[in-house]
Every structure is written in structure tokens, then in C-alpha cells.
């Protein structure tokens, strides 16, 4: 049985700011773009979260929830330098490290002999080292499989950890909400709920052939995850080829204008994900994807090392020309990443690599 640790830094960008600027401590603080440029919140302190402020939220709306919010621009170079420190700490315990972003990673410590091979003690040691050497706290989840380690890391935040052992896994999974399974978003969860499926235990008791008939390949994944099965290994040399975001719509939409109304939220989320990328790399294309209500899809791309919102809207219009009267059930945007590293100055906010000036 594998031993997987998921490390997640606690409100990372904001925590770095509070470490370096003590006057921010204990106050509602957010890192993100300014409201007058339609900025988005990258992350925020726990004090800000008490007011309902969240990552990926429009900055203007965050100020409505918390008028006393302190907003600071991101210092991406600093965040990257600290992330490298944290990565070096990971490497003391295992070479099998899969970074997900600057502030989280999977570690496979199955072969680690330190602390007599106890993943629980290894996670404690890693968190202790991070605090001692960076002044930042981290939370951890420990489990035999990746997705449950990630779920567990969120259960004892901040500055804590949660363990799912092989013995406790069956009972833990049985009551786990399906929303915790990767790929189950709001719309999919509603469809599952309409079938009486809300927890992994519900799926375990449901007809497997019917799930496969209704959800195809994803139905098979759902069956496995609901039993706590996740055979994915740690991709130690993983390098993302693209960064994207998509949304499955609650109801099919049919007009270009309706699709255009969905775009601002997608663009804000894409900007946030780009700002959290572990490396700055050249962008070589941008892409718009539509999935129709007959489950066929189309993609339109534009090759360029400069990305603009205007082009996203142009690509959307081109994709809609292929609609042929069908309803749109999913809309997505992404950028393709080249192998070489960017040699341009840092843009210190959540709009990194996106020209948000229409």
C-alpha cells in the first residue's frame, strides 16, 4: 500500500505578506488585482475569509463583503523563491514530488526510511521544517491514494494534518460527498443527486452498468473513486502543457451573447491559475472550446505569444459559427505553454500574462 502526502500551504501568498510585513497580521488581507482594473483575489487571510472573501472572487465584490479589506499586489518572485525553499525541504524526504502549484504538492514517501517509514511522522517533520525555515505553516493529508490525500489536507486546516489509513479508508469513503471527487462539479453533482447519489456510499450501492451507460468513461472513474481506488502515480517530472478553465452550464445556452456573459468569470479564473503556475513559461497559443448538447465538441485556437481578451472573444465567435443550432453545455478557455522559460519582467498581480485592458 502506498503512502501519499499532500502538502498545502496555508493561505500562501497572504501568509508570505504577513510574514514580511507584521503590520498585516491579524487583519483582513488579500493579495490580488485592483478593483478598478477588474482584478481578482488570488488568496486572502483567514481574517478576510470570515467575511466571505475567497480566492478567484472579483476584487470589487470582495470590498463589498469586507470594506476594511487590505489589498496588496502580488510579489510573484518572492513567492517562487519561497516555493523553491519548500521544494528543497520535500526533497530531503523523497525524490517523488509532484508540484501542483507554488503552494501545494503530492509526495510519495512509500520508500522513505526516516521515522521508521511512518508517513504521519514524516508529514509532521516536513511541516515542522517548513515552519522553522520559512516562518510559514502548512497543512497535510496522508492517505494510500492521491485524491484522498488531497481531501484529507483540507480537514484540519490551518497548520494541521489528517490521516486516512488503509483500515479507516472504507468507512471514510462511504460518507464522503461526491463533490470531493475530482471532476464532480456543481452540474455533475446535481445530475448525480437527481439519481439519489450524494455520497460515495450511494455510488457503491448503485447499478454499475447504469452508471457506465449514463456517464461513460467518467462513470468508471466515479465507481473507482467511490471505492477509494486511485491508481495514479506521482508524476515527478510533470510539466504542464497548458493552463485552462471550463464550466459545465446548468442549462444549455444558444446565443453568442449568452456565451459572452460567461466569459469574464472564466477569464478571471484563468488569470488566477496562471498566477499560481510554478514557472513562468512562454504562451504560444490561446484556445476556446465548446461542447454541444449532442456531446460533440469543437475547439478554435490562435497561435501567438501575446494573449488578449479580445482574441478570446474572437475565437468564441468563430466557434459559435459551428453551432448548427445545437445548445452549448460547456464553455472553456485555455492557453498553451511552450517549453522555454519567459524572459520578461514579472507582472505582480493575478492578471499575469493576460492583457485585461479591453
Curated annotation (Swiss-Prot):
Top-level taxonomy: Bacteria, Pseudomonadati, Pseudomonadota, Gammaproteobacteria, Alteromonadales
Record flagged with keyword Magnesium: yes
Residues annotated as transmembrane: none
Active site, UniProt feature: 104
PANTHER family in UniProt: DNA POLYMERASE KAPPA, DNA REPAIR POLYMERASE UMUC / TRANSFERASE FAMILY MEMBER
Gene that specifies this protein: dinB
Assembly notes: Monomer.
Protein EC: 2.7.7.7
Functional summary from the UniProt entry: Poorly processive, error-prone DNA polymerase involved in untargeted mutagenesis. Copies undamaged DNA at stalled replication forks, which arise in vivo from mismatched or misaligned primer ends. These misaligned primers can be extended by PolIV. Exhibits no 3'-5' exonuclease (proofreading) activity. May be involved in translesional synthesis, in conjunction with the beta clamp from PolIII.
UniProt name for this protein: DNA polymerase IV
Reactions accelerated catalytically: DNA(n) + a 2'-deoxyribonucleoside 5'-triphosphate = DNA(n+1) + diphosphate
Family stated for the protein in its record: Belongs to the DNA polymerase type-Y family.
Residue sites binding Mg(2+) per the record: 8, 103
Subcellular location field: Cytoplasm
GO CC, alphabetical: cytosol
One MF term in the entry's GO annotations: DNA-directed DNA polymerase activity
UniProt xrefs under Pfam families: IMS (PF00817), IMS_C (PF11799), IMS_HHH_1 (PF21999)
Organism: Shewanella baltica (strain OS195)
Keyword Glycosyltransferase: no
UniProt KW keywords: Cytoplasm, DNA damage, DNA repair, DNA replication, DNA-binding, DNA-directed DNA polymerase, Magnesium, Metal-binding, Mutator protein, Nucleotidyltransferase, Transferase
Coiled coil: none
Domain UmuC, chain residue ranges per copy: 4-185
Positions of the record's site feature: Substrate discrimination: 13
Amino acid at each position: 500500500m502506498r503512502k501519499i502526502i499532500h502538502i498545502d500551504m496555508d493561505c500562501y501568498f497572504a501568509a508570505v505578506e504577513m510574514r514580511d510585513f507584521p503590520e498585516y497580521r491579524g487583519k483582513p488581507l488579500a493579495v490580488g488585482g485592483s478593483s478598478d482594473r477588474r482584478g481578482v483575489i488570488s488568496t486572502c487571510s483567514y481574517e478576510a475569509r470570515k467575511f466571505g472573501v475567497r480566492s478567484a472572487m472579483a476584487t470589487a465584490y470582495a470590498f463589498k463583503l469586507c470594506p476594511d479589506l487590505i489589498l496588496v499586489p502580488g510579489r510573484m518572485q518572492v513567492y517562487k523563491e519561497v516555493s523553491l525553499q519548500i521544494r528543497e525541504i520535500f526533497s530531503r524526504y523523497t525524490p517523488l514530488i509532484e508540484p501542483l502549484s507554488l503552494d501545494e504538492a503530492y509526495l510519495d514517501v512509500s520508500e522513505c526510511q526516516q521515522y521508521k517509514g511512518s508517513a504521519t511522522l514524516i508529514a509532521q517533520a516536513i511541516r515542522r521544517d517548513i515552519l522553522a525555515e520559512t516562518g510559514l505553516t502548512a497543512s497535510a493529508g496522508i492517505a494510500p491514494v492521491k485524491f484522498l490525500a488531497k481531501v484529507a489536507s483540507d480537514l484540519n486546516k490551518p497548520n494541521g494534518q489528517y490521516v486516512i489509513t488503509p483500515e479507516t479508508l472504507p468507512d471514510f469513503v462511504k460518507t464522503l460527498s461526491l463533490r470531493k471527487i475530482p471532476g464532480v462539479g456543481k452540474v455533475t453533482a446535481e445530475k448525480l443527486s437527481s439519481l439519489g447519489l450524494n455520497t460515495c456510499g450511494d455510488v457503491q450501492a448503485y447499478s454499475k452498468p447504469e452508471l457506465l451507460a449514463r456517464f461513460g468513461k467518467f462513470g468508471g472513474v466515479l465507481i473507482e473513486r467511490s471505492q477509494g481506488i486511485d491508481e495514479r502515480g506521482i508524476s515527478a517530472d510533470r510539466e504542464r502543457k497548458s493552463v485552462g478553465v471550463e464550466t459545465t452550464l446548468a442549462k444549455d445556452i444558444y446565443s453568442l451573447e449568452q456565451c459572452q456573459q460567461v466569459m469574464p468569470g472564466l477569464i478571471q479564473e484563468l488569470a488566477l491559475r496562471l498566477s499560481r503556475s510554478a514557472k513562468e513559461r512562454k504562451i504560444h497559443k490561446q484556445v476556446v472550446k465548446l461542447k454541444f448538447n449532442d456531446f460533440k465538441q469543437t475547439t478554435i485556437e490562435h497561435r501567438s505569444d501575446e494573449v488578449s481578451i479580445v482574441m478570446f472573444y474572437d475565437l468564441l465567435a468563430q466557434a459559435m459559427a459551428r453551432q448548427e443550432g445545437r445548445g452549448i453545455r460547456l464553455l472553456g478557455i485555455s492557453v498553451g505553454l511552450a517549453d522555454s522559460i519567459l524572459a520578461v519582467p514579472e507582472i505582480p498581480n493575478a492578471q499575469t500574462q493576460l492583457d485585461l485592458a479591453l
